């Protein structure tokens, strides 16, 4: 506990809360170019090959984005749109790549939750 004199000399500094998605810089989405597309394995109780991409954003940030859904057409130099949202079992993955936007195709044969995966309405 500081004394009154200590508080007069240097007042209390308000702690800034850390941002969960700093690379977006307050934007809802950001555009970027894939620099590497690869698979990685999740944390302990889970087991899979999760598809992720390293993306260089238009503001210069380099982030890792998760590619949701079954199958994808992304490769190096693909232009993608990124949104916030982490993947709990992949450390360091704090962004999602939007499906059906720019170079990313929607998920084929998707019947439910289509808007999340950029899939058109089946005929």
UniProtKB/Swiss-Prot annotation:
GO biological-process terms attached to the record: translation
Protein task: With S4 and S5 plays an important role in translational accuracy. Interacts with and stabilizes bases of the 16S rRNA that are involved in tRNA selection in the A site and with the mRNA backbone. Located at the interface of the 30S and 50S subunits, it traverses the body of the 30S subunit contacting proteins on the other side and probably holding the rRNA structure together. The combined cluster of proteins S8, S12 and S17 appears to hold together the shoulder and platform of the 30S subunit.
Stored HAMAP family: Ribosomal_uS12_B
Pfam families: Ribosom_S12_S23
GO molecular function, a single term: structural constituent of ribosome
Taxonomic lineage of the native organism: Bacteria, Pseudomonadati, Pseudomonadota, Alphaproteobacteria, Hyphomicrobiales
The gene coding this protein: rpsL
GO cellular component, one term: small ribosomal subunit
Originating species: Rhodopseudomonas palustris (strain BisB18)
Keyword annotations from UniProtKB, A to Z: Methylation, Ribonucleoprotein, Ribosomal protein, RNA-binding, rRNA-binding, tRNA-binding
Family assignment from sequence similarity: Belongs to the universal ribosomal protein uS12 family.
InterPro entries the record matches: NA-bd_OB-fold (IPR012340), Ribosomal_uS12 (IPR006032), Ribosomal_uS12_bac (IPR005679)
Subunit structure: Part of the 30S ribosomal subunit. Contacts proteins S8 and S17. May interact with IF1 in the 30S initiation complex.
NCBIfam families: rpsL_bact
Name used for this protein in its record: Small ribosomal subunit protein uS12
